[in-house]
Each structure stands twice: as structure tokens, then as C-alpha cells.
Amino acid sequence: MSGALNAFTIKGGFDFTMDMRRKDRHITQPDRIVSIIDGCSVCRIAMQDGEGLYIVPLSFGYEYSGVDNIKLYFHSANEGRKLRAITARPDVAFEMDCMEGITQGDTACAYSCAYKSITGTARASIVCDTEEKQRALSLIMEHTVKKHFDFNSEQAAHVAIIRLDVKSISAKGSD
């Protein structure tokens, strides 16, 4: 990928340069990154609390208005370990991937996975604004089931919405 970016500068001047061994698999084009996000149905959030490391897979929705402005949204119960961890330590990591199949070979070591993946870091927050919660719920449903739903304020009040403001992102794939 000659001429491709090796790093993204994300909000706040954060540079993320992945020292990736397989440079031929590093995906840096914003449109391809968005395509990978579109193809993933689950995002895992990794966080830490007083009990230790914690990772949880969640369905999600997102807003993209440039590689330096990606917001991932998740819904949750209004209480629990995840919310306590985010409140205590809002810096988190995330991962999503799309397995596209198995590449077969003549020997066991020649087999491989065809995949695309995204990893990154983010600042997590609990959304309190009712309109943003309603929009986030709609985004989650649009991404998950490819259908638009509207939510009223009462429905939004019954769930917690977690927003990840992406600070760094890296994509990789086996094209």
C-alpha cells in the first residue's frame, strides 16, 4: 500500500501507529475501516475495575463523521459491573472482527482464517442526554437489524447508553 497512511491522528493529537508485522494486512483507508465496522455485529469492550480486567461482547451502533470522530454506542442495564468499571476508569480498549472463512491448505500449517478486524482505544462515558440516548438506540437497531426504530423518552430512560469516543483505531485484514 504505497502512499497509505501509517498512522491516524485522532482527537487531542493522539497518534496511533501500529507496529504491525504484516504491513500488507494493515488497512488505513477510512472507507475500508467504515466497511469493516459495518460488517461486524459484535464489539468487545475491555476495561478494568477493582476486581481486575473485564471484557464484554456487545451489539452496537455508531456515528462516523471522519476518522477523527467515531462514536460507538452500546446499551446496557442501568446498573452492574460494566457501568461501575466505566465510571471508575473510563479509558477502555475495544475490538471487533468479521471472520470470512477458512483458507484451506495441503498441511495443517497452511490453513488460515480470512478475516478483517479493528482494534482501538476510547474514552467511555454514560450518556445522560435523553435525545442522544434515543438516537443511540436507533443507531444500535439500524446497525444490528438493518431497520430503523424510533424510541421515546420513557424507553430511553429504562436503559443505560455507553458511548465510546474513539481515541485510536487500527484495522487489519487478510484480503
Where are these regions (language model features)?
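Helix-adjacent hinge/juxtasegments
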Residues: 75-76, 81-104
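Short Pro/Gly-enriched beta-strand edge/turn motifs at strand-loop
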Residues: 27-28, 39-44, 144-147
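A generic structural signal for short beta-strands and their flanking turns/coil linkers
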Residues: 41-43, 54-56, 68-70, 88-92, ...
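Extreme N-terminal tail/first-helix region
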Residues: 7-38
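Short beta-strand segments
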Residues: 40-78
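A generic structural signal for nonpolar/aromatic side chains embedded in well-ordered alpha-helices
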Residues: 36-37, 85-86, 140
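Charged, gly/pro-rich active-site loop segments
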Residues: 14, 19-24, 99-175
